[in-house]
UniProtKB/Swiss-Prot annotation:
Annotated keywords: Antimicrobial, Disulfide bond, Fungicide, Plant defense, Secreted, Signal
Localisation: Secreted
Protein's UniProt keywords contain Cell cycle: no
Gene Ontology, cellular component aspect: extracellular region
Protein name: Putative defensin-like protein 270
Length: 73
């Protein structure tokens, strides 16, 4: 009985830590992105970011209700 209680407490602690880390990430407003306008795919962002393909410093990421936006790193 005691081991099942300790397993339960350990599980709760792990869940608490995971939720806490996730909420910290969500609340972090700092961003390395410079947003440069709408896009449909990554290739749309190369010119906006001033990069040449196949650079990985340009992303086309979802931005809420605004659709997808170029993120220049």
């Amino acid at each position: 009985m005691m081991s099942s209680k300790s397993h339960f407490v350990a599980l709760l602690l792990i869940i608490f830590l995971i939720v806490n880390v996730q909420s910290t990430r969500i609340m972090d407003d700092s961003s390395d992105c410079v947003f440069k306008g709408p896009c449909q795919r990554r290739s749309d962002c190369y010119e906006r970011c001033g990069l040449k393909p196949p650079s990985r410093a340009a992303l086309c990421q979802p931005m809420g209700l605004q659709g997808r936006v170029c993120c220049c790193l």
